Amino acid sequence: MRKITLACAATLFCVLVALGGCSTHSQEPNNEPEEQQASSQQPVDVRAAALKGPTAMGLVKFMDEAEAGTVSDNDYSFQIAASPDELTPQIAQGSLDIACIPANLASVLYNNTDGAVRVLAVNTLGVLYICDSNGSIQSVVDLAGKTIYASGKGSTPEYALNYILEGNGLTPGRDVTIEWKSEHAECVAAMTKDSQAIALLPQPFVTTAQMKDDSIRTALDLTEEWNALQNDADASSLITGVVVARADFVDEHPEAVEAFMKHYRESVAFVNEDIEAAAEPIDTYDIVPAAVAQKPFPRATSSAWKVTK
């Protein structure tokens, strides 16, 4: 298994290994018929959240089914947030049960809550890009003396960008100025207003920017730049997002957690396999417009929305 060595994610790796997903205790065999066991279980309120982008896209079929009542094993409610800052206090305070969040934020929450948060799955790999409009950025060193618009301070985008800059001999804040915005949409707006602007964007926001200004291009793929800094085949992989749950919730409702992950996997498979059908609910939930949602899928599918237990 490849190691996860994202800055501040050594702890995350320990969480993944030590906690092993959502399994918590061995149980005595139950010889009741499966239907009888299912009918005897009371529905559980499961409060879930995700960020606008690939992780929220992967949930749309699940959300649709929960809203329509076709998924009825538990009572699921969903929240889509624009920024990790909206979800962090809710997870820490117990008003959310399961959330799709940046990988390093999971590590921070694990430490800040003394292990009260568990990682269930890795759901998003590398979907981050440096974009420009004038072709001036051909390599990481070309960022020297430049200003980069970015969102996600204190989470994966910041740590990944800093790692890549430092690996190429550039010091963030000294050699490269990073102007942090509260949302990726603000970075897109900055690029469309200034032809000299450079931005760090994930998909599908890259496509959103390109649909507004066709001169915007992906100058650098941060996954490729990350891999270029690794020295051996067993080196780290750039992990962007994970699924986490409150430890108390996992212990109290293991069947509900298993059911959630099953529905999530099925939803992810639907999004990957039927782009056109997935685009409509993605638009409906105001994640991104349908026209935008369809375009990044071919590039993002290989790395995003792959849910593993």
Question: Where in this protein do the model-derived segments appear?
Answer:
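Short, low-complexity disordered leader/linker segments with a strong preference
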Residues: M1-D45
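Surface-exposed acidic, glycine-flexible loop patches that form ligand/cofactor-binding
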Residues: C8, V140-V141, D251-E252
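Short, glycine-/small- and polar/acidic-enriched structural segments
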Residues: E28-K181, S195-Q203, S215, A219-L222
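An extracytoplasmic/periplasmic, membrane-proximal ligand-sensing/linker region
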Residues: S40-V44, Q210-D213, E276-K309
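Short, solvent-exposed loop/beta-turn-alpha elements that line the ligand-binding surface or hinge
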Residues: E67-N74, T223-S236, S302-K309
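Pocket-lining segment of extracytoplasmic ligand-binding domains
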Residues: N104-L105, T113, E179, E186-P281
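Flexible glycine/proline-enriched surface loops and loop-helix/loop-strand junctions
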Residues: A144-K146, V242, T301-S303
